[in-house]
């Protein structure tokens, strides 16, 4: 039988350049050699993808950016002295702002790795190195702690990977979330006009929101940081803008990546003071851009006091000022027949096309009536048609010409932002509009909750990112490896047939077979646990003995859960053997008796003499009054998530944070669609589930609640 290998992946994630790539690669190689000396079955892997060339190229780009700033500064001065037009001066000022921003970002990129402390995980690594630690050696401990412990919830994370599009490993996702949140916090705190106070206010609005808003906290912080990096705003102002982008984007069914792309273009435009084609094209990559374009048109016409606005349209309809011919030219000659059909359905009596035209003339048709027939774009399309004949008004047809003329100034864009915020406030309570969005929000909720649990867990034990040491590395390697075996077997049996036909559906027969295979795999794993293997396990775990007990406890609970799923009451015969005696179990206890409420630190039985041997106790537990160095529950949102992890192999029990047996919402008749949502039974999970249920039910979707 082949010997088991323990694999530690040592990675260096910089999002940019490395200050000394050769040294980093040497560290990886040294770790590998040391591991082989310690345990010939250990295998350390790692690679540096950014070589020294990266820093040289960045330095070269910075020099060019600085040169560009100097040239533009001189050009601007010459333009002002030579009597250039206002448009020419504004264009140069805009280019200068962008060049300065680019130079600042490049300069920050170069300085970040070498000088900044505490910025994301890379900052934590720098901090550890400055304290005398080994760069990659310490980083591998941090990464391996997360990787090893995440193996303990392999069933949880594996079970939801298909459902919520978690494309990368849980440990990497957690660290990415951590880095993003730390970076956003640093940027917001330093760029908001009210600093750290503004950061607290910004996140205070999020914390007061619903569960779905909270689930996007990290992404919203990133949006806020983008806005505050380009323009002077307070925490409250930044949140209003970000909330509007998020609410309008959600209503359009757009994901966070698309919202970030729009925000970047908007921030550049606001920062330069005038809207230019490059920024506008960036914003127009999605439907968000079209929405904001309508706001810009309305704002420009308002400030010039020309044309008609969206606020004035309802009154114009009420007073019968909208002509039937205008509607025909804008929406087609059959507009009246479409409206007649809708009014007949609404009123329950026959309404003719002639009747519709009389209703229009008498002011009996509202904006909502037209929106119901012609969609959300009705208002902007009609206003554009009406304003085409208004002298000096901005329309979709002349938008680019007006943009080149500098019509969309800072004042106009700020007014457009206000209108955008008003639209966002109306939409904020409606929540997601597509199933893909719901999946994304569940995923974000899982990642955000995992990070909150990670930070709380570290704080509870008196640890920080820079103090994870050899104990944790050894514990996570060994415990993670053992747990990973079981998790891999159980989840592997199920995921083989998940979405087999690529249609998002799994038949009952296929699911039943997969569940039985998975249950057998878990059962077989526990049947193989015996004194010999655990004894070797104990010898290797060393100072992490308490984590072994927690593993054993968790394993027993998982075993019990499998037995319950099988509707059997089979117990492990006889006593628990020598390992049970060593850990203080009653002589003839079953696994269920031994682990139901047992914890050796609080038990009267002290098999290892910790209470008598204070030196050994101090060595094992440190100075934290018995608190556990690391807890397997950090990343699973609570003890019950780990204890019931095996539920992930049972699709009709509770999986973790959402599993769907249907394809997307919106392509079928929702009133006849049967959707099942499974959410982990934590408080946050239940709140998220409830909001999703309510949202879907309001839209006529039939649900099976479990």
Curated annotation (Swiss-Prot):
Keyword Coiled coil on entry: yes
Question: Could you say which residues bind Ca(2+) here?
Answer: 499, 501, 503, 505, 510
Task: Check the record and name the PROSITE patterns matching this protein.
Answer: EF_HAND_1 (PS00018), EF_HAND_2 (PS50222)
Question: EF-hand domain spans which residues?
Answer: 271-290, 361-380, 496-521
Q: Which residues form a coiled coil?
A: 9-113
Provide the alphabetized UniProt keywords.
Answer: Calcium, Coiled coil, Metal-binding, Repeat, Viral release from host cell, Viral tail assembly
Q: Which GO terms describe its biological process?
A: viral tail assembly
- InterPro entries (alphabetical): EF-hand-dom_pair, EF_Hand_1_Ca_BS, EF_hand_dom, Tape_meas_N
Query: What is the stated purpose of this protein?
Result: Serves as a base for tail tube protein polymerization and acts as a template for tail length determination.
Belongs to which family?
Answer: Belongs to the Mulikevirus tape measure protein family.
Q: Write down what this protein is called.
A: Probable tape measure protein
